[in-house]
Amino acid sequence: ENHNNYLQRLHGLFNYGIKRGYLAENPTKVIDKVKVAETEPAIFAAEEIKALLNAVPRRAVPYFAIGSFAGLRPREIERLDWTDIHLEEGYIRVRPKVAKTASNRLVDIQPNLRAWLLPLSCESGPVTPPNIRKIREAAQHKIGLTQWPQDGLRHSYASYHLAHFKNINELATQM
């Protein structure tokens, strides 16, 4: 967490104290927020995604394919069950207990994702194998990736989806 996040939380806490009569004013008013330079999120090149998918064991392919071609967050993929993946109907159901936002959403399965998932699909059970971080690190080393950007697969999906479909509103509903 950064300075601004802490400041925001403290501001709310002190406002609560003011409403209860414990304080006359909020002391966080005099603290300046830190100006954070906006940076573009790092993404993977298409060749890197292909190399990654070919470098991981078969059992881990669905995790990386869903991150790359459906844009789910790592924790969302880790919580997915195969019963959430509807290949025939063409969507992944991200249930509230799976989603970061605790809301239900349906994410389209694009043809490239379907092609990766179809030969590996199961009727039920966890999508993500145990020790996914170790699997990722081994594959990353194998293909020579020195950095693993936070949410890199998700950001890659967003960038490529927007470039292909040119519809920010559609992308927002998928994310």
Language-model segments: which ranges?
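Basic, Lys/Arg- and aromatic-enriched nucleic-acid-binding interface segment
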Residues: 4-6, 19, 23-74, 78, ...
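A short, basic/aromatic helix-end/turn motif that makes direct DNA contacts
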Residues: 79-85, 172-175
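N-terminal core-binding DNA-recognition domain of tyrosine site-specific recombinases/integrases
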Residues: 1-15, 20-22, 38, 126-131, ...
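Well-ordered beta-strand positions in beta-sheet-rich domains
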Residues: 91, 104-106
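Catalytic-site neighborhood detector that most strongly recognizes the C-terminal catalytic loop/helix
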Residues: 35, 43, 94-102, 114, ...
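Short, basic (Lys/Arg/His-rich) helix/loop patches that form interaction surfaces
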Residues: 54, 61, 70, 107, ...
